[in-house]
């Protein structure tokens, strides 16, 4: 299911910082403040609600490692993100695989690009989307500048990254690498039910009661 327009235009209206600030710093996230996010963390909920960059990746990896101190309990990662930095996203991805805990992923609103990749990287059987979530896959991109030699090096590295992302997405979805490569060559949009059929998620849920542990909500 394709949608018109590039994802960068879709991202314009999204809140760009929804994680708690450090103690003593001004609160962020539309006035919600640290208390809300500390309460969520106490319920083992992590929220990715912005483009993926180094700052948010450091916060999320730290939270994953903190919650991993109780290795037998699920961690709930809610995702509403237009994507972002591949290297920052890979730090989150590798930490998700590194810890013993099951990481339950839930798409809400938009899970695009690296947001989709992290969604699909959740524990098998525990990857969900809300009914009106949209998911986008596409190939990694980068603006190339500099000398001809530098551009050649960066282009080769980008091709390597594209192959690696396709390999990992294939592992998490059951689709072939060739299929992933074809489908991500241009923006490909999925609604929640199409994402389930493709293997990006395991189920579509409308209420917290339909998820393991109530999605951390106590439902």
UniProtKB/Swiss-Prot annotation:
Function: Cleaves peptides in various proteins in a process that requires ATP hydrolysis. Has a chymotrypsin-like activity. Plays a major role in the degradation of misfolded proteins. Probably partially responsible for degradation of ECF sigma factor SigR prime.
Cellular localisation: Cytoplasm
Main location: cytoplasm
Summary of subunit composition and partner proteins: Fourteen ClpP subunits assemble into 2 heptameric rings which stack back to back to give a disk-like structure with a central cavity, resembling the structure of eukaryotic proteasomes.
Reactions that this protein is recorded to catalyse: Hydrolysis of proteins to small peptides in the presence of ATP and magnesium. alpha-casein is the usual test substrate. In the absence of ATP, only oligopeptides shorter than five residues are hydrolyzed (such as succinyl-Leu-Tyr-|-NHMec, and Leu-Tyr-Leu-|-Tyr-Trp, in which cleavage of the -Tyr-|-Leu- and -Tyr-|-Trp bonds also occurs)
Pfam families: CLP_protease
Regulation: induction: Expressed from 2 promoters, 1 of which (clpP2) is positively regulated by the thio-oxidizing agent diamide, probably via SigR. Probably a clpP1-clpP2 operon.
GO-annotated biological processes: protein quality control for misfolded or incompletely synthesized proteins
Protein name according to UniProt: ATP-dependent Clp protease proteolytic subunit 1
Keyword hit for Transport: no
InterPro entries per record: ClpP (IPR001907), ClpP/crotonase-like_dom_sf (IPR029045), ClpP/TepA (IPR023562), ClpP_His_AS (IPR033135)
Catalytic machinery residues: 113 (nucleophile), 138
Claim: Lipoprotein is one of the keywords in the record: no
Organism of derivation: Streptomyces coelicolor (strain ATCC BAA-471 / A3(2) / M145)
Gene: clpP1
Disruption phenotype: A double clpP1-clpP2 deletion increases the stability of ECF sigma factor SigR prime from 10 to 23 minutes.
Taxon lineage: Bacteria, Bacillati, Actinomycetota, Actinomycetes, Kitasatosporales
Molecular function terms from GO: ATP-dependent peptidase activity; ATPase binding; serine-type endopeptidase activity
EC number(s) reported in the record: 3.4.21.92
């Amino acid at each position: 299911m394709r949608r018109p327009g590039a994802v960068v235009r879709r991202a314009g209206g999204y809140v760009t910082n929804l994680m708690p600030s450090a103690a003593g710093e001004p609160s962020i996230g539309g006035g919600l403040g640290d208390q809300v996010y500390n309460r969520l963390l106490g319920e083992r909920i992590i929220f990715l609600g912005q483009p993926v960059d180094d700052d948010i990746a450091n916060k999320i990896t730290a939270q994953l490692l903190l919650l991993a101190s109780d290795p037998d309990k699920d961690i709930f990662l809610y995702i509403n993100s237009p994507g972002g930095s591949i290297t920052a996203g890979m730090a989150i991805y590798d930490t998700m695989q590194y810890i013993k805990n099951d990481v339950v992923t839930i798409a809400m609103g938009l899970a695009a690009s690296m947001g989709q990749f992290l969604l699909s990287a959740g524990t098998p059987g525990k990857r969900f989307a809300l009914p009106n979530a949209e998911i986008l896959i596409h190939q990694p991109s980068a603006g190339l500048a500099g000398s001809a030699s530098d551009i050649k090096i960066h282009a080769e590295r980008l091709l390597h990254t594209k192959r690696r992302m396709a390999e990992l997405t294939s592992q998490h979805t059951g689709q072939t690498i060739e299929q992933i490569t074809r489908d991500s060559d241009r923006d490909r949009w999925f609604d929640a039910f199409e994402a389930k059929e493709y293997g990006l998620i395991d189920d579509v849920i409308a209420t917290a009661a339909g998820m393991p542990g109530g999605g951390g909500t106590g439902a």
